[in-house]
């Protein structure tokens, strides 16, 4: 009868795969007779129909795909490996308040010049690096911040590479660029189970000593580095893990910098070296656009690392400067991308470490 209502909702979010067909059982649907095929096929869709008489039949009064709730960033971080004067595998956890903890005994092969990123939504991975020669081993990080033993490498052994998280669920990662006997541009995807895939042919200018971070909630960006000189070019990573061609550089060309996400959907490149130590930063918008230089805060340094913490904040830590070859200080990044002054270091002073977030 007139005014009758029916509601359909895709609670399982599978209509994009299976869809539904509504049979109006001899009645019209939006003025069309029963021979008209009515199909809906969008994940998360909700349809609310009402009967409005023989002429119009059933008519939809609501047809809307409900968006997934935003996936929050990880709460804690971890800095690991590096060079303390000799190669090390120690790690330092970062709390959800940005407090760096004391050293955790090494697990896995000591090395430097490696990279780290997130996978699985709440876990991390350290990979590749320099053990005295180029390496392709990886070490998974649990959602409790526990580093696992070595996993036999996949992909070209290299050092001076970078890595970041990507995908709509924030559950995959990518390692890219680096150095073997020269600068390279290949990449290796990391599945949501932490499995590293074989080399993908490089896109963009081959380079080493670059940095990478997430932006837009589901994408990544590699930037800066060194070819035959310092560069500021960037390469965006889609939410399918596809690296785009070079984007003309913005900001001071430099190498040995670090990057992390902040504000849940933005990123920041910071510090580095271009003939002298730098403390400048460059913010990355949620569209992957890199901003011009922001004046440096904190001790100018290079060969440091960075990660997010607290869901929407970041931290730069460790590294080296002109007067102190090994540092342990850190600088917090607010959810507005503002870098704070130096925090007294905790843990073994070192350079050329890596970092990622978890939990």
Predicted feature residues:
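Acidic, glycine/polar-enriched metal-coordinating patches/loops
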Residues: 1-68
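Kelch-like beta-propeller repeat domains
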Residues: 36-40, 48, 63-359
């Amino acid at each position: 009868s007139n005014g009758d209502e029916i509601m359909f909702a895709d609670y399982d979010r599978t209509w994009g795969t299976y869809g539904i067909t509504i049979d109006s059982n001899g009645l019209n649907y939006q003025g069309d007779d029963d021979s008209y095929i009515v199909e809906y096929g969008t994940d998360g869709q909700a349809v609310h129909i009402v009967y409005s008489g023989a002429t119009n039949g059933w008519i939809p009064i609501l047809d809307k795909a409900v968006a997934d709730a935003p996936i929050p960033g990880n709460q804690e971080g971890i800095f690991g490996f590096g060079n303390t004067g000799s190669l090390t595998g120690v790690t330092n956890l970062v709390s959800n308040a940005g407090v760096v903890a004391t050293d955790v005994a090494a697990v896995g092969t000591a090395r430097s010049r490696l990279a780290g990123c997130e996978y699985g939504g709440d876990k991390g991975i350290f990979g590749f690096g320099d053990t005295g020669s180029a390496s392709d081993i990886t070490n998974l990080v649990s959602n409790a911040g526990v580093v696992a033993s070595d996993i036999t490498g996949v992909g070209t052994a290299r050092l001076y590479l970078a890595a970041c998280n990507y995908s709509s669920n924030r559950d995959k990662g990518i390692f890219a660029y680096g150095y073997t006997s020269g600068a390279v541009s290949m990449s290796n995807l990391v599945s949501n189970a932490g499995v590293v895939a074989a080399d993908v042919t490089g896109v963009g200018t081959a380079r080493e000593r670059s940095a990478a971070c997430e932006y837009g909630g589901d994408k990544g960006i590699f930037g800066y580095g060194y070819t035959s000189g310092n560069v500021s070019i960037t390469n965006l990573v889609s939410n399918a893990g596809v690296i785009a061609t070079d984007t003309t550089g913005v900001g001071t060309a430099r190498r040995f910098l670090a990057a992390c996400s902040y504000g849940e959907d933005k990123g920041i490149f910071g510090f580095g070296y271009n003939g002298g130590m730098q403390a400048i930063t460059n913010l990355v918008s949620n569209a992957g656009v890199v901003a011009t230089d922001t004046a440096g805060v904190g001790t100018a340094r290079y060969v440091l690392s960075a990660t997010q913490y607290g869901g929407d904040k970041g931290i730069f830590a460790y590294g080296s400067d002109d007067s102190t070859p090994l540092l342990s200080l850190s600088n917090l990044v607010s959810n507005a991308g503002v870098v704070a002054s130096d925090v007294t270091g905790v843990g073994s002073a070192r350079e050329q470490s890596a970092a990622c977030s978890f939990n």
